[in-house]
């Protein structure tokens, strides 16, 4: 019984964008007993979760665990540098600001993965002749994304390309009449 009680304390549920939750569930490993998402140690999302873990306030009531992503809280031991060790059974609270930071990190990982997939296809386009929309559809099927459309992902990629290499507007000149 003690093991189950501890397991229930070291997982938390957060509410983020539905497509990011679907992506995280398919992309990262799951804890076998709790079915919670486990982020790999050393990843930016893992570090963000660990940095934002806090003790719940004594006078705060326990919030209902509602959300679309259940996270297995990281457990880092104090290393050579003498850093703090946060026991996830006690440091199991994530503030709304922390949830926003975790969501931003997950969005960054998602966008990086999507862009890497599309750019890889662009590089090999001469051989495969696969259209961008087909690559995006395959990406969506790979991660089981139903909460976002292909058009939204293509628009996201187009914004990224425009931001990385903006087009210079053409300068018009009047013709001089002779």
Task: Please place each PLM-identified region on the residue numbering.
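Long, low-complexity interaction regions most often at the N-terminus
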Residues: 1-91
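Generic detector of leucine side chains in alpha-helical contexts
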Residues: 7, 20, 25, 53, ...
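Short amphipathic alpha-helical surface micro-motifs
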Residues: 52-54, 97-98, 134-136
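Membrane-targeting and insertion segments and their boundary/processing signals
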Residues: 84-88, 92, 124-127, 131
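Short helix/strand-capping turn motifs
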Residues: 89-93, 99, 103
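K/R-rich mixed-charge low-complexity regions
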Residues: 101-178
């Amino acid at each position: 019984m003690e093991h189950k009680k501890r397991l229930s304390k070291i997982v938390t549920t957060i509410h983020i964008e539905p497509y990011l939750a679907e992506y995280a569930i398919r992309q990262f490993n799951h804890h076998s007993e709790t079915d919670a998402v486990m982020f790999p140690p050393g990843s930016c999302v893992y570090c963000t979760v660990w940095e934002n873990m806090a003790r719940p306030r004594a006078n705060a009531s326990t919030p209902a665990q509602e959300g679309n992503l259940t996270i297995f809280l990281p457990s880092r031991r104090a290393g050579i540098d003498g850093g703090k060790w946060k026991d996830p059974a006690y440091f199991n609270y994530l503030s709304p600001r922390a949830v926003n930071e975790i969501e931003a990190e997950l969005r960054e990982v998602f966008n990086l993965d999507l862009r890497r997939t599309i750019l890889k296809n662009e590089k090999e386009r001469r051989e495969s002749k696969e259209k961008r929309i087909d690559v995006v559809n395959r990406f969506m099927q790979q991660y089981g994304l139903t909460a976002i459309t292909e058009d939204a992902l293509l628009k996201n990629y187009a914004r990224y390309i425009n931001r990385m290499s903006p087009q210079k507007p053409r300068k018009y000149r009047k013709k001089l009449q002779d």
